[in-house]
């Protein structure tokens, strides 16, 4: 989504 939450290589 907006890049608000990132985990390892995944931003949502």
Swiss-Prot record:
It is found in: Secreted. Disulfide bonds join 6-11. Its main location: secreted. GO terms for cellular component: extracellular region. Urotensin is found in the teleost caudal neurosecretory system. It has a suggested role in osmoregulation and as a corticotropin-releasing factor. Belongs to the urotensin-2 family. This is Urotensin-2A. The lineage of its organism: Eukaryota, Metazoa, Chordata, Craniata, Vertebrata.
